[in-house]
């Protein structure tokens, strides 16, 4: 067992959201943290001492997912308002908006090269978008219920998705077809992702399980049941050797995938934990949940061994490199129960410099002629029962989520800038939005016509060439 100096430690915590944290992501350079919340806001936290935090105002409903682009120059967010927004992560808050789906959008994910964005929605579809042209490319339809998550493989050749239809599907991005399907008769996966080498996927189950699958041989490799509540999120360490899980039982757990066992149980949140993510280098990880707190942890464990493994896995991200055959996981499926010889860490939520943990917040309103937001008068849903009901199967809720639990009311929103402060009347913005939608449809129609015209010209050219060859042959015979 690791010594105390190698155990994870709580480094900082942040408070600024007024409702449950739904998603978070650390920037590629490790200097910023983006968080999404049930309060409809996106927040950007800077790790520099005394730096100001930014609160992005614009989404009309719960922000369900957030992710930095691979270069850190863009921030994508998904919302129950059926849109996806791309933000520039600075104080200007400039953004572009996709009218992405016909139902709430549950997840966003950039490809490793940053050229594509995958979105998953409750309209049962996955959509892929071009970031270069900022336009829709294609849809993937095979799920029969809400799609909760969709992730690119490290080489961009595959997409994995999970749905409330109790299936996990693997999609080929070249032919846009479903090439593999994993099903479960008990529960559905809340979250799914590829390991850094792209050879395996892991799923976070509503049935309290974590499963690891080999996508090359289509077999279940590992099965963990270490939580007492639904598992909401997972994150692979960049080395691929560790997996961290977030659960409605209020804990984070760290699994050693090489040895196939639980090594740490982290208790810091009060209530369900909805999201967790390692930094790109693996030295940090962050977590968020129903208590509205964002906790930043320092990893510490296996620090010496991870650097070489991380470099080896990063090399596999090249598009010409197939998955490495030296898989790190056991070859036969076997279940794992929680073991006694694990380390339990329950930090006191106290940081020496509280001012750093709760920095001043700058509200950034989104002004853009291509999008509109609702007027003031929004009320926040309760951060306990309703948030949990959205993320979890009601039958699998932890006691903190049940209606009988005493719930604290959310804070008043009157101190935040509201949309009614805009000088543009709502009727005008509605008209502008309608015009922009029609222009988008017109642009897509023109693009399709251009493609058809190109095909027609190519066919006509072939006909003329064949005709010329035929005339030449006739003249030679005569």
Curated annotation (Swiss-Prot):
InterPro entries per record: G-protein_beta_WD-40_rep, WD40/YVTN_repeat-like_dom_sf, WD40_repeat_CS, WD40_repeat_dom_sf, WD40_rpt, WDR55_POC1
UniProt keyword list: Cell projection, Cilium biogenesis/degradation, Coiled coil, Cone-rod dystrophy, Cytoplasm, Cytoskeleton, Disease variant, Phosphoprotein, Repeat, WD repeat
Record function comment: Plays an important role in centriole assembly and/or stability and ciliogenesis. Involved in early steps of centriole duplication, as well as in the later steps of centriole length control. Acts in concert with POC1A to ensure centriole integrity and proper mitotic spindle formation. Required for primary cilia formation, ciliary length and also cell proliferation. Required for retinal integrity. Acts as a positive regulator of centriole elongation.
PTM description: Phosphorylated in mitotic cells that may be mediated by CDK1.
Protein family membership: Belongs to the WD repeat POC1 family.
Keyword match Aminoacyl-tRNA synthetase: no
Protein name: POC1 centriolar protein homolog B
Subunit structure: Interacts with POC1A. Interacts with FAM161A. Interacts with CEP44; the interaction is direct and recruits POC1B to centriolar microtubules. Forms a microtubule-associated complex with POC5, CETN2 and FAM161A. Interacts with CCDC15.
Residues found modified as Phosphoserine: 321
Tissue expression notes: Expressed in the retina.
PROSITE patterns found in the cross-reference section: WD_REPEATS_1, WD_REPEATS_2, WD_REPEATS_REGION
Biological process (GO), any one: single fertilization
Places the protein is found: Cytoplasm, Cytoskeleton, Microtubule organizing center, Centrosome; Cytoplasm, Cytoskeleton, Microtubule organizing center, Centrosome, Centriole; Cytoplasm, Cytoskeleton, Cilium basal body; Cytoplasm, Cytoskeleton, Spindle pole
Disease in which the protein is involved: Cone-rod dystrophy 20: A form of cone-rod dystrophy, an inherited retinal dystrophy characterized by retinal pigment deposits visible on fundus examination, predominantly in the macular region, and initial loss of cone photoreceptors followed by rod degeneration. This leads to decreased visual acuity and sensitivity in the central visual field, followed by loss of peripheral vision. Severe loss of vision occurs earlier than in retinitis pigmentosa, due to cone photoreceptors degenerating at a higher rate than rod photoreceptors.
CC terms in the record's Gene Ontology section: centriole; centrosome; ciliary basal body; cytoplasm; spindle pole
Coiled-coil residue spans: 431-470
WD repeats: 16-55, 58-99, 101-139, 142-181, 183-223, 226-265, 268-307
The organism's place on the tree of life at top rank: Eukaryota
């Amino acid at each position: 067992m690791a010594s105390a100096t190698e155990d994870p430690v709580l480094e900082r915590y942040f408070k600024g959201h007024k409702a449950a944290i739904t998603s978070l992501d650390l920037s590629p350079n490790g200097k910023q943290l983006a968080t999404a919340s049930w309060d409809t806001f996106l927040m950007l936290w800077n790790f520099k001492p005394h730096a100001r935090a930014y609160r992005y105002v614009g989404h009309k409903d719960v922000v369900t997912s957030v992710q930095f682009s691979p270069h850190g120059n863009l921030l994508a967010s998904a919302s129950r308002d059926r849109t996806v927004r791309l933000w520039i992560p600075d104080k200007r808050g400039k953004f572009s908006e996709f009218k992405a789906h016909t139902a709430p959008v549950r997840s966003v994910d950039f490809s490793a090269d940053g050229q594509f964005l995958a979105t998953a929605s409750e309209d049962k579809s996955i959509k892929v978008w071009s970031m270069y042209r900022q336009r829709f490319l294609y849809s993937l339809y095979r799920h029969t219920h809400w799609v909760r998550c969709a992730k690119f493989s490290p080489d961009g050749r595959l997409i994995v998705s999970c749905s409330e239809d109790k299936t996990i599907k693997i999609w080929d991005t070249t032919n846009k077809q479903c090439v593999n399907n994993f099903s479960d008769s008990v529960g559905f996966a809340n979250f799914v992702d590829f390991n850094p080498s792209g050879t395996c996927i892991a799923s976070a189950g509503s049935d309290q399980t974590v499963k690891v699958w080999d996508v090359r041989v289509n077999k279940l490799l590992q099965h963990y049941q270490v939580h007492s509540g639904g598992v909401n999120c997972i994150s692979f360490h960049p080395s691929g050797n560790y997996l961290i899980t977030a659960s409605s039982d209020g804990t984070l757990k760290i699994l050693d995938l090489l040895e196939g066992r639980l090594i740490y149980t982290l208790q810091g949140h009060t209530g369900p934990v909805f999201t967790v993510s390692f930094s790109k280098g693996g030295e940090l990880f962050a977590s968020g949940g129903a208590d509205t707190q964002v906790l930043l942890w320092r990893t510490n464990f296996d620090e010496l061994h991870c650097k070489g493994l991380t470099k080896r896995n990063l090399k596999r991200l090249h598009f010409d490199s197939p998955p490495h055959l030296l898989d790190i996981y056991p070859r036969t499926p076997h279940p794992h129960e929680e073991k006694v010889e694990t380390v339990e860490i329950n930090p006191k939520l106290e940081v020496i410099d509280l001012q750093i943990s709760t920095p001043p917040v700058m509200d950034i309103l989104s002004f853009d002629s291509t999008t509109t937001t609702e007027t003031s008068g929004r009320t926040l849903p309760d951060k306990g029962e309703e948030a949990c009901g959205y993320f979890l199967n009601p039958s699998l809720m932890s006691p903190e989520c049940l209606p009988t639990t005493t719930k604290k009311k959310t804070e008043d929103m009157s101190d935040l800038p509201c949309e009614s402060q805009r000088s543009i009347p709502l009727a005008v913005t509605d008209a502008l939005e309608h015009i922009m939608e029609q222009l988008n449809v017109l642009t897509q129609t023109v693009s399709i016509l251009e493609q058809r015209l190109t095909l027609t010209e190519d066919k006509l050219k072939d006909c003329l060439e064949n005709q010329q060859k035929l005339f030449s042959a006739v003249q030679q015979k005569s």
